[in-house]
């Protein structure tokens, strides 16, 4: 028999009760997490979002409530009234927040039963993730996911409070916008009223937040959903959330200072971690030189060492020919890894090949010196010079790649991260921030045979480099900056172009005709002609930030209703087909598959 809630009101959450509540009458509501029948007394662990309380059903005290407890099973929904009591001596559970008390039931309502669960909620390590996503409403009852999402809510509240205190105004920008596909593909929304025309869901509020600066709002922020129709991986979703900010009459230093304060507030209050300010900075060129990537993980060493000048005249033609042909040779010293087996080194070689390396040379440092197939090609002086460059000691393993600069940096940069994970060097409880600055403004796209924006087309060049935008584009640096945490880019921003003629020049450099630029971005170009202030901003990926704060392996563990890597919601069965009438109203006819 199912009971109605009636006029019952909850007095406490299950996780709130402590020794100080002993003797109080309470009303609790929640789910049966566990039920134990001791041949008379029935013990139920009653769970809600705040925690668990042990509930005791005694047939002598309340036979009616005891009968309901006998029929209850896991995930049944109960409401109980009772008295908080101290647990008997020897039964206190110090691992539980409520472990010193129990509630002696005087009344019970069985509000709803539950079917048998497709998986248990107290440890689902071996449960297929697709099953968890199909039954997401059950998955979300687990403590870890609930804690993740409640912490996410706290981070959002901290963000709003901090930015509001610093003069930012929270404003919404449109979700139905114009398609300007310059990067990832847009999600398109057909217009019923304007048949044959489409809105696009925004990949970011970029243009609208710049226009808000033109409009004089000075400081804007928004915690906003964005959409990209792209191939997915563990830290990507088709819909994602950004902490989006823009400021007027500022330079890079102003933005960095304010945003460092935001990160310090979030990590102190949400994670109990002090962020040392100011955050370390590194130019793009330094990051590539030392770590091979522009998002370096600074929790460990394994820095790259440039060896080109040492080996360019050596007897090892593989290295010498690469350097003399315009390539480079770099290596890294994997400290204490000299005992690594040949198979393990072969596995590292195959990993490096994924990123374009043709091979991976190695040297094991022994008491006798170099142990390596390439040792015979180098003079003692060359070996000594390389040993010094590597700070090589007995027991170390030296790894080398020779190729074009991009291949060398990509392969060794990724190999560095791979080795750190393999060797346990990435402590999830250590948080190392670094700002990466002075990015290139443009990069040459070999496939398209044109220049492409490294960040986006609205990023301003350095003042001193503006003169080279047409004559020497590869020389230009951008007023761009990324915030990297433990090897993950968590935020990216720039000072924007605020002059129409410079923005038009940038579009021209990206291969857009004047007509095409006007068609796609005419409203921005028009706005820039009406007294646009210098401005800039940044956007933080909230999903990725929460993944790092919580130590999760995937952003799917910090999003309430994520999609799969194929962009599907297994719970609601989206995306799905629509009926013919809806398509006719939109003027759409589907092509045959």
From Swiss-Prot:
GO terms for cellular component: cytoplasm. Residues 206-209 are annotated as: Aspartate. NCBIfam families: aspS_bact, PRK00476.1. The lineage of its organism: Bacteria, Pseudomonadati, Thermodesulfobacteriota, Desulfuromonadia, Geobacterales. It comes from Citrifermentans bemidjiense (strain ATCC BAA-1014 / DSM 16622 / JCM 12645 / Bem) (Geobacter bemidjiensis). This is Aspartate--tRNA(Asp/Asn) ligase. The record marks 38, 90 as: Important for tRNA non-discrimination. Aspartyl-tRNA synthetase with relaxed tRNA specificity since it is able to aspartylate not only its cognate tRNA(Asp) but also tRNA(Asn). Reaction proceeds in two steps: L-aspartate is first activated by ATP to form Asp-AMP and then transferred to the acceptor end of tRNA(Asp/Asn). ATP binds at residues 228-230, 237, 489, 541-544. The gene is aspS. Homodimer. PROSITE patterns: AA_TRNA_LIGASE_II. The keyword Transmembrane does not apply. It catalyses: tRNA(Asx) + L-aspartate + ATP = L-aspartyl-tRNA(Asx) + AMP + diphosphate. Keywords: Aminoacyl-tRNA synthetase, ATP-binding, Cytoplasm, Ligase, Nucleotide-binding, Protein biosynthesis. It is found in: Cytoplasm.
């Amino acid at each position: 028999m199912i009971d109605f809630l009636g006029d019952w009101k909850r007095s406490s959450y299950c996780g709130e009760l402590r020794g100080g509540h002993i003797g109080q009458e309470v009303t609790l509501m929640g789910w049966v997490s566990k039920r134990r029948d001791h041949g008379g007394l029935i013990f139920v662990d009653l769970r809600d979002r705040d925690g668990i309380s042990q509930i005791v059903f005694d047939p002598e005290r309340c036979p009616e409530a005891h009968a309901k407890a006998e029929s209850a099973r896991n995930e049944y929904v109960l409401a109980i009234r009772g008295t908080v009591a101290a647990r008997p001596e020897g039964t206190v559970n110090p691992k539980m927040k409520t472990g010193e008390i129990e509630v002696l039931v005087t009344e019970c309502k069985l509000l709803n039963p539950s079917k048998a669960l497709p998986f248990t909620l107290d440890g689902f390590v071996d449960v297929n993730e697709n099953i968890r996503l199909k039954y997401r409403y059950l998955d979300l009852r687990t403590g870890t996911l609930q804690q993740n999402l409640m912490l996410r809510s706290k981070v959002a509240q901290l963000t709003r409070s901090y930015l509001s205190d610093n003069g930012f105004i929270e404003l919404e920008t449109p979700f139905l916008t114009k398609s300007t596909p310059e990067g990832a593909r847009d999600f398109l929304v057909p217009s019923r009223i304007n048949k044959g025309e489409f809105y696009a869901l925004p990949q970011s509020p970029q243009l609208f937040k710049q226009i808000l600066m033109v409009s004089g709002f000075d400081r804007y922020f928004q915690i906003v959903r964005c959409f990209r129709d792209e191939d997915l991986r563990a830290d990507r979703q088709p819909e994602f959330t950004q902490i989006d900010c823009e400021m007027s009459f500022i330079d890079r230093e102003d933005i960095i200072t304010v945003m460092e304060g935001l990160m310090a507030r979030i990590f102190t209050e949400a994670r109990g971690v002090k962020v040392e300010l100011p955050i370390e900075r590194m130019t793009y060129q330094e990051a590539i030189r030392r770590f091979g990537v522009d998002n370096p993980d600074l929790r460990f060493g394994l820095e790259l060492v440039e060896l080109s000048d040492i080996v360019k005249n050596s007897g090892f033609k593989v290295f010498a020919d690469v350097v003399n042909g315009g390539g480079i040779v770099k290596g890294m010293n994997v400290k204490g890894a000299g005992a690594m087996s040949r198979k393990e080194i072969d596995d590292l070689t195959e990993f490096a090949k994924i990123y374009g390396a043709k091979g991976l040379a190695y040297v094991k440092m022994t008491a006798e010196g170099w142990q390596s197939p390439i040792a015979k090609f180098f003079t003692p002086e060359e070996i000594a010079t390389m040993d010094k460059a590597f700070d090589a000691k007995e027991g170390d393993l030296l790894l080398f790649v020779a190729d074009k600069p991009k291949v060398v940096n990509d392969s060794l940069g990724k190999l560095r991260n791979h080795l750190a994970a393999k060797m346990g060097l990435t402590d999830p409880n250590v948080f190392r921030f670094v700002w990466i600055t002075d990015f290139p403004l443009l990069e040459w796209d070999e496939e398209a045979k044109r220049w492409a924006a490294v960040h986006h087309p609205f990023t301003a060049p350095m003042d001193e480099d503006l003169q080279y935008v047409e004559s020497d584009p590869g020389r230009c640096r951008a007023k761009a900056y990324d915030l990297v945490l433990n090897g993950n880019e968590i935020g990216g921003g720039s000072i924007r172009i605020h002059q129409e003629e410079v923005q038009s020049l940038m579009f021209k450099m990206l291969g857009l005709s004047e007509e095409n630029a006007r068609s796609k971005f005419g409203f921005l170009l028009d706005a820039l002609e009406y007294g646009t202030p210098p401005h800039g901003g940044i956007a933080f990926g909230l999903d990725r930030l929460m993944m790092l704060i919580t130590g999760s392996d995937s952003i799917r563990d910090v999003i309430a209703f994520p999609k799969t890597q194929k962009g599907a919601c297994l719970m609601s069965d989206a995306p799905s087909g629509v009926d013919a009438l809806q398509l006719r109203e939109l003027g759409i006819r589907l092509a045959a598959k």
